[in-house]
């Protein structure tokens, strides 16, 4: 099984980085193949230019995007790891989705509507948030945070989302809660590998 980690946090010593390391630990332990796309480390350009939109119609992709698409094609399971910024994903990850999950690669148009082209792939989303769970639920933000990436992007492209784990109050919780989150993530990855 091939595992692709799409990591969108600018800090190497963040809790998001600990999540990434926990996934890598499990994947290595089970002798699985994995690749990491650290969007900040590779200085990914998130800006979708108009000429790219035109090129997508002819399935013409710039070399950097074609490379990222090859990573998606290679993967059986994709992990998205990112912090919540303004109740959404960081702009660098949104730009990654805008540019990489392009028309002709990730989805196409049919007389019956859009059709996803990435069926058979699975995704896990691990998202940290500074806000409390109660606050997210009271303001209906939790559902909107899930809808955008899970339904509006990944499922639209045919990818099955197996879990979207939002970890709230990430800056206020104690170390033992961080460790509990990491254990839960390791179990999730292990269960996926053992399927």
Predicted regions and their residues:
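Hydrophobic residues at beta-strand termini and immediately following loops
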Residues: 37, 126, 164-167
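Short, glycine-/small-residue-rich phosphate/pyrophosphate-handling segment
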Residues: 108-156
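N-terminal beta1-alpha1-beta2 submodule of the flavodoxin-like/Rossmannoid cofactor-binding fold
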Residues: 1-105, 169-195
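A generic structural signal for alpha->beta connector loops
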Residues: 31-33, 120, 158-161
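Generic secondary-structure boundary/loop-capping signal
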Residues: 41-44, 102-104, 115, 151, ...
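Glycine-rich phosphate/pyrophosphate-binding loop and the adjoining helix
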Residues: 136-195
């Amino acid at each position: 099984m091939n595992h692709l980690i799409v990591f969108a946090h600018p800090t190497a010593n963040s809790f998001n980085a600990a999540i990434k390391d926990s996934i890598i630990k499990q994947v290595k332990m089970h002798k699985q193949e994995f690749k990491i796309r650290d969007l900040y480390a590779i200085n990914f350009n998130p800006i979708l230019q108009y000429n790219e939109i035109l090129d997508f119609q002819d399935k013409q992709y710039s070399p950097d995007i074609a490379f990222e698409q090859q990573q998606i094609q290679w993967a059986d399971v994709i992990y998205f790891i990112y912090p919540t910024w303004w109740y959404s994903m960081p702009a660098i990850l949104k730009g990654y989705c805008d540019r990489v999950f392009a028309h002709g690669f990730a989805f196409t148009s049919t007389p019956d509507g859009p059709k996803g082209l990435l069926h058979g792939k699975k995704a896990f989303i691990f998202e940290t948030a500074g806000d409390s769970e109660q606050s997210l639920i009271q303001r209906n933000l939790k559902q909107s945070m899930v809808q955008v990436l899970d339904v509006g992007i990944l499922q639209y492209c045919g990818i099955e989302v197996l879990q979207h784990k939002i970890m709230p109050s990430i800056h206020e919780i104690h170390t033992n809660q961080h460790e509990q989150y990491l254990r839960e993530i390791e179990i999730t990855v292990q269960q996926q590998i053992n399927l």
